[in-house]
From Swiss-Prot:
Belongs to the ferrochelatase family. It holds the Pfam family Ferrochelatase. It comes from Ectopseudomonas mendocina (strain ymp) (Pseudomonas mendocina). The lineage of its organism: Bacteria, Pseudomonadati, Pseudomonadota, Gammaproteobacteria, Pseudomonadales. This is Ferrochelatase. GO terms for cellular component: cytoplasm. Its EC number is 4.98.1.1.
């Protein structure tokens, strides 16, 4: 075995559907300053208020989609890890979660103890956001610094416009699109608008309806919304979809702050009102199915759409461990630049 490891990193999951485990997970997640970017006292107060009721509600939601093997996100990520072991010939392939287990800290320590000296860190987020990509990288930096680990890193950058990722999306989604549909909704995870403004010193973001399409390369590099729209446009182009056949929305809004629009819950009602009966929904910001896809879209979203007058909502599975995605990820990781 060589000393160059691949570390796949995703968001994470509670250890179980018990309320105590869900509360512990939500506390770790929401107290991350890259997720709720408020000063510590305000963040602590807000999270404490959220944790009064949300753990029980979230535990119920997790229980509705939990598998016998465990959390769908963790199970599917493990399957991807196992598949990558047959493609990554440079050393061990490990999986870590930013929140929950297996932790980034324990995984990096284990790799260092095994004699690994080079790590390709792969945050499994196609589009860039501080609350996803940055927090994974910063956690790895913290661990290396505090534990004095002798590790060098290359980091997989956002791959929202990379042909390998887009081709894998096409390969995984094509069988569902070929079954016939009235409309395709590309539902990305949402973000508070302030997250975009914070990373845009130029003041370009959200200044007009067309701001994402006219973004400079510098703005595009850190604008999550622009990267989502670019992914959607490139996917639709590859699939030969006409503009009226598809649209984009943003899901998973939390709290009362203004988040990027349009909201998925609003679009579901609008599409039903427009006469759409057979709706396909893809979630291209997620590479593995999780509570946001299986429960928020596959269960609650379907129920909302049907109640609004639609007939069926088909959730297209995420990339998960699709063979084309495994092959694509190998290529993307092997050309990851040196960083950290």
């Amino acid at each position: 075995m060589t000393d160059h490891a691949l570390l796949l990193a995703n968001l994470g999951s509670p250890a179980s559907t018990e309320v105590a485990d869900v509360r512990r997970y939500l506390n770790q997640f929401l107290m991350d300053p890259y997720v709720i970017d408020l000063p510590w006292p305000l963040r602590r107060l807000l999270v404490s208020l959220i944790l009064i009721k949300r753990p029980a509600a979230s535990a119920h939601a997790y229980a509705s989609i939990w598998w016998d093997e465990g959390s769908p996100l963790v199970v599917l990520s493990r399957r991807l890890q196992e598949a990558m072991k047959t493609h990554w010939s440079h050393g061990p392939v490990e999986l870590a979660m930013r929140y929950g287990e297996p932790s980034i800290e324990a995984t990096l320590q284990r790799l260092a103890d095994q004699g690994v000296r080079q790590v390709t860190l792969a945050p499994l987020y196609p589009q860039f956001a501080d609350s996803t990509t940055t927090t994974v990288i910063e956690e790895a930096k913290r661990v290396v610094r505090q534990r004095s680990l002798d590790l060098r890193f290359s980091v997989l950058p956002p791959f929202y416009d990379q042909p390998e990722y887009l081709d894998a999306l096409v390969a995984s989604a094509k069988p569902y699109l070929e079954q016939g549909f009235d409309h395709l909704l590309l539902s990305f995870h949402g973000l508070p608008e302030r997250h975009l403004h914070k990373l845009d010193p130029s003041g370009h973001c959200l200044k007009g309806d067309d701001c994402c399409r006219t973004a400079s390369p510098a703005v595009l590099a850190t604008c999550y919304r622009a990267q989502c729209l670019r992914s959607a446009e490139l996917f639709a182009e590859r699939m030969g979809l006409r503009p009226e056949q598809w649209s984009v929305s943003f899901q998973s809004r939390l709290g009362r702050a203004k988040w990027i629009e349009p909201y998925t819950e609003t679009r579901l009602d609008e599409l039903a009102a427009q006469g759409v009966k057979k709706l396909l929904v893809m979630c291209p910001a997620f590479v593995a199915d999780c509570i946001e896809t299986l429960e928020e879209i596959g269960d609650r979203g379907r129920e909302q759409f049907v109640e609004a007058g639609g007939e069926s909502l088909q959730l297209v599975p995420c990339l998960n461990d699709h063979p084309d995605w495994v092959a694509a990820l190998k290529v993307l990781c092997e050309r990851a630049p040196q960083a950290l």
